[in-house]
Amino acid sequence: MKNEIKKFRTKLGITQEELAEKAGVRRETIVFLEQGKYNPSLKLALNIAKELKIPIDKLFSLS
C-alpha cells in the first residue's frame, strides 16, 4: 500500500514524534509507514488521516 504521510506531515510542519503521539503509536511506527514497510490497521489509518486533516483516500492508495 502506498501512502503520502510524509508529504502531508511535512506540509503541516509536524514531526514524526508529534504525529505518533497524536495517533497513539510509537515514532518507529510512523517511520515504517512512511517507508512503506508497514500497512496500518484501519483504525490507525483513520487516526492519521484525521490528524493530518486529509481524506483517507488522498493519504493511502493501493498502487
Language-model-detected regions and their locations in the chain:
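Short, charged recognition helix plus adjacent turn
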Residues: 11, 50, 61-63
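Key DNA-contact positions within bacterial/archaeal DNA-binding proteins
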Residues: 17, 28, 57
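DNA major-groove recognition helix of helix-turn-helix/homeodomain DNA-binding modules
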Residues: 43-58
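Short basic helix-loop element that most often maps to the first helix and adjoining turn
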Residues: 3-21
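Residues in the recognition helix of alpha-helical DNA-binding motifs
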Residues: 8, 22, 33, 62
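Absolute protein N-terminus
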Residues: 1-4, 63
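Recognition helix of helix-turn-helix/homeodomain-like DNA-binding domains
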Residues: 25-38
